[in-house]
A protein has these predicted regions:
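Canonical BTB/POZ domain core
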Residues: 1-64, 70-75
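BTB/POZ (also called T1 in voltage-gated K+ channels) oligomerization domain detector
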Residues: 1-29, 136-140, 144-165
Length: 165
């Protein structure tokens, strides 16, 4: 665990709030390369904090981290340009993990098709198969526009929340 992620864990233990960096100018379309890079880096740090919470069996931390990640995506116009966070999640979590479900849904509904093609070699094989099956099921029922709307409507806490019992 790198020092900054450990520092964020200690901060959460004492304050019960997730430390994160607000990225300036995320609402500008398209975001600058610098803004995009900062956004990618901050989301990766939050993903690492979620994984640390998973390893330490800290579901409240994991759930608060997910709330912050979702807020960052809702506030900004950035899309994750890097794909390293996806492989990181797949390498560090188990099949069926709540964060894997979140990542799968994000890639299906929010990632541009050209970006997926460009980086398909970076995506875990089981993610690609799962995405294919989910997307086919959804697209058969709805068109593209309604599918995007559905993603936004379906972002409910129960999809990614870790049970706290």
């Amino acid at each position: 665990v790198d020092a900054e992620i450990f520092d964020r864990l200690v901060f959460w233990i004492y304050t019960k709030s997730v430390k994160y960096r607000l990225i300036k100018d995320v609402e500008i379309i398209p975001p600058s390369k610098e803004t995009q890079t900062k956004f990618d880096e901050e989301v990766m740090k939050l993903m690492k904090l979620w994984v640390l919470g998973d390893k330490l069996l800290m579901p409240k931390l994991q759930n608060q981290v997910m709330i912050v990640i979702i807020k960052m995506w809702e506030l900004g116009k950035c899309h994750l340009e890097s794909t390293s966070w996806i492989s990181y999640i797949w390498d560090q979590t188990m099949v069926g993990s709540p964060i894997r479900r979140f990542v799968r849904a994000h890639v299906i509904y929010c990632t541009r098709k050209t970006h997926c093609f460009q980086h398909s070699g970076d995506l875990p094989q089981d993610l690609l198969m799962d995405m294919l099956f989910r997307a086919q099921e959804t697209e058969k029922i709805l068109g593209k526009r309604d599918t995007r709307w559905l993603w936004n409507a379906q972002q409910i806490e129960s999809d990614w929340k870790v049970p706290e019992h």
